[in-house]
């Protein structure tokens, strides 16, 4: 759905692309979730709807038992941002983490201490710095961990953090930030942090997904009307649990569905 109304000052753009507030509306969130300011302040609604959507989705679950909602057991929240600010030398600004403990008597909705958000933040910052420094010739900076009053870390019913990954205003940060390999490394570090946090909370072992295969090729097979697939597994020097042991090849014919796979 598009809004071409000149009175709103909006361009020819999909509602879901106009920010979290309108994305939540068109995703079917209830009016109180996306319009707490009743249409008078889109900016504040856009900021708050992110947390309110989490609370509505998780409401009624064991992690948010007292709030009405859809009962989805969401265990944590991470808001990924980029930061402003620049340096006059060639140094990297780096990553900042934000959490909030001074709210609701220091408790989350399930009764957990809000310092769980600090633990979550620490995991993200540690993993990001380790993985980026190990992959790139860059002295990636771990900045502060702020215990401050931000909507995205105050309002969620579950442990939450804001990760200011890098400065979009600083040349040294963006020199890496535009590199697809950096984007993959940072994204994988975030994924590993989430996996480690959730498994630790449940006292479970975890296994990180292996890296994509290398040298993939397709050749005509020795038998008629057959193809031979070949590839090489890739070990992850940053994660010992990510060693590949086997692969599953799924097949589909035409527009049909994929089969159950062959190991």
Ranges and model annotations:
Residues 1-14:
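Single conserved hydrophobic/aromatic residue that forms the stacking wall/gate
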Residues 12, 36-44, 65, 105-115, ...:
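Second-shell loop/turn segments in exported
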Residues 26-32, 72-76, 157-161:
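Loop/turn elements at helix/coil->beta-strand transitions in domains of secreted/extracellular proteins
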Residues 197-241:
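Pro/Thr/Ser/Gly-rich low-complexity, intrinsically disordered linker/stalk tracts
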């Amino acid at each position: 759905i598009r809004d071409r109304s000149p009175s709103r000052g909006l361009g020819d753009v999909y509602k879901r692309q106009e920010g979290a507030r309108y994305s939540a509306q068109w995703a079917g969130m209830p009016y109180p979730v996306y319009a707490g300011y009743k249409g008078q302040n889109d900016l504040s609604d856009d900021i708050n709807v992110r947390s309110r959507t989490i609370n509505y989705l998780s409401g009624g679950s064991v992690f948010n038992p007292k709030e009405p909602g859809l009962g989805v057991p969401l265990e944590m929240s991470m808001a990924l941002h980029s930061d402003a600010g620049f340096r006059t030398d060639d140094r990297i600004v780096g990553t900042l983490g934000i959490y909030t403990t001074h709210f609701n008597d220091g408790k989350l909705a399930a009764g957990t201490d809000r310092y769980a958000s600090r633990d979550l933040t620490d995991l993200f910052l540690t993993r990001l710095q380790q993985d980026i420094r190990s992959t790139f010739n860059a002295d990636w900076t771990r900045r502060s961990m702020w215990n401050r009053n931000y909507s995205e870390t105050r309002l969620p019913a579950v442990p939450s953090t804001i990760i200011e990954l890098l400065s979009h205003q600083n040349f040294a940060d963006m020199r890496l930030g535009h590199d697809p390999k950096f984007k993959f490394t940072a994204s994988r570090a975030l994924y590993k942090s989430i996996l480690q946090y959730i498994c630790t909370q449940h006292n479970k072992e975890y296994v990180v997904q292996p890296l994509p295969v290398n040298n993939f090729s397709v050749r005509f097979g020795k038998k008629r009307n057959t193809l031979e697939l070949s590839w090489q597994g890739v070990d992850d020097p940053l994660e010992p649990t990510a060693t590949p042991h086997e692969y599953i090849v799924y097949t589909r014919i035409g527009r049909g569905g994929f089969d159950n796979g062959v190991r």
